[in-house]
Regions:
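Boundary/activation segment at the start of structured domains
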Residues: 1-80
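Detector for Asparagine
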Residues: 13, 49-52, 63, 157, ...
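Short, flexible/disordered intra-domain loops and linkers
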Residues: 38-53, 150-159, 194-208
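A general structural detector for well-ordered alpha-helical segments in enzyme core domains, enriched
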Residues: 64-68, 169, 213, 217
Length: 355
């Protein structure tokens, strides 16, 4: 929707109408993942989930994108608030994409769009002006190298270039497409680093944050950008090792609880039949014992949630070949081990003129 405001600039000046855009987009952008061919740094820092193997690596970004949708405000029927899921389709099988679309639209009421080149992302941002909408938040989930977010990492020289969000694309981000309070978050490796320093920052060495992709993007879009100077780790996408062990143990407890619940229902049914029989006969003594007690769950609701997520991932793994999680990643992206000497976590980059 739009709000029309009138302002009087002076006694001799005509009244003017100023249109204030009040329609906002919250946008998740998901790259394609090719875990079989990782650069040496990513292979070291983004450890594969042992239980899921490389099949799990293939849906890291998708699962985090689904998780991110849940962090946004709920979309409204009049689209004044809209959640958007953009996905680069390179090397994702159609069956997987169709299921992701069903989850995004059906479970989260978000708009689902497929991209085949980086120009599609640039055009999407530019179209916010034509549609009189503004981006309130944008999140990138993809591989990354210094000075670029790689939405098609190691997909082939031509394709990789066409799916690269680099300095040139960052400078194309029209500030008018973003709300004044908008934020961009990059969960790609080293978006906040100014040049490739290898695996450690030497004493006295300048990481040149001011020359990073994050800073260039902040200046172009005139908003704050949050990015990692280090490589990023997706190893807890399916939960920490403790989470996964607990989920397996909870699954065992759930099976036991299911059997106990079935036994309880049989005992309860028998108890009710005996009560009814005694009431009908009037000569038969009613059961003198109290009704059976239902079994108590030996696990928390959170434990059950993690266990059921694991079960659903296994089902998807059998059906699609990958452990898609319609509830999203269990744990957020974190900092990797390198480059050593750089801050852990996300750094905030403000437009230069605001610093």
């Amino acid at each position: 929707m739009e709000e029309q405001k009138q302002s009087q600039t002076g006694p001799d000046n005509p009244t003017t109408e100023v249109q204030a855009v009040a329609d906002f987009d919250y946008v998740t952008v998901v790259g394609c993942s090719v875990p079989q061919i990782l650069d040496s740094w990513s292979a070291r820092d983004i450890a594969s989930n042992v239980w899921n193997g490389q099949a799990g690596d293939k849906v890291w970004f998708i699962n985090h994108g689904i998780r991110q949708l849940q962090q946004y405000p709920t979309g409204t029927p009049d689209y004044s608030i809209q959640r958007v899921f953009l996905i680069f389709t390179e090397q994702y099988p159609r069956k997987l994409l169709d299921e992701v679309k069903s989850i995004v639209e059906g479970m989260y009421g978000a708009s689902y769009r497929e991209l085949t080149s980086i120009s599609g992302l640039v055009d999407f941002v530019q179209m916010r002006l034509k549609k009189q909408r503004r981006i309130k938040q944008m999140d990138f989930y993809a591989h990354g190298v210094v000075h670029s977010v790689e939405f098609g990492y190691e997909t082939g020289n031509k394709t990789q270039t066409e799916l690269r969000f680099g300095l040139a694309q960052a400078r194309m981000m029209n500030e008018l497409a973003f709300d004044d309070e908008a934020r961009i978050f990059s969960y790609a490796c080293r978006t906040g680093l100014g040049f490739d320093i290898g695996d450690r920052l030497d004493p006295g060495e300048d990481p040149k944050y001011s020359e990073s992709l994050a800073q260039v993007l902040a200046d172009a879009a005139d908003i704050r950008v949050n990015a990692f100077p280090r490589r990023t780790s997706y190893e807890n996408t399916f939960g920490t090792s403790t989470d996964r062990k607990a989920a397996l143990e909870t699954q065992r407890k759930m099976e036991q609880n299911k059997r106990e619940q079935e036994q309880y229902l049989r005992r309860l049914d028998d108890y009710r039949h005996r009560l009814k029989a005694a009431d009908n006969a009037r000569t038969t003594s009613a059961p003198d014992e109290p009704p059976p007690e239902p079994p108590v769950k030996p696990y928390s609701d959170e434990d059950e949630k993690l266990a059921r997520q694991m079960e659903l991932r296994e089902i998807y793994k059998q059906e699609l070949g990958v452990p898609l999680d319609k509830h999203g990643a269990v744990r957020p992206v974190s900092s990797g081990k390198t480059p050593e000497g750089l801050p852990m976590g996300l750094m905030s980059f403000s437009p230069t003129e605001l610093e």
